Amino acid sequence: MAVKLRLQRFGNHKRPFYRIVAADAKAPRDGKFLEIVGTYEPIKGAVAVDSEKVQAWMNNGAQPTDTVKSLFKKFNVLNK
């Protein structure tokens, strides 16, 4: 099973809120996931990530999507 770190959308119309989750690559965007590793609020510009969980998933072969990878770089998540 290929695992991806990706965004799962929540919130209301024009008020998005995202969870950063570890999910099977074949699962739908808002479908089942394996674990929540963080959140992203684009309106506030805030990211809250459990970097230990992210490192554990990436060490086990999980690949972040391009969007999640750019969020990690922008908010300096993996360099802590």
Curated annotation (Swiss-Prot):
InterPro entries: Ribosomal_bS16, Ribosomal_bS16_dom_sf. This is Small ribosomal subunit protein bS16. Keywords: Ribonucleoprotein, Ribosomal protein. NCBIfam families: S16. It holds the Pfam family Ribosomal_S16. One of its GO terms (molecular function) is structural constituent of ribosome. GO terms for cellular component: cytoplasm; small ribosomal subunit. The keyword Ribosomal protein applies. Belongs to the bacterial ribosomal protein bS16 family. One of its GO terms (biological process) is translation. It comes from the Bacteria. The keyword Oxidoreductase does not apply.
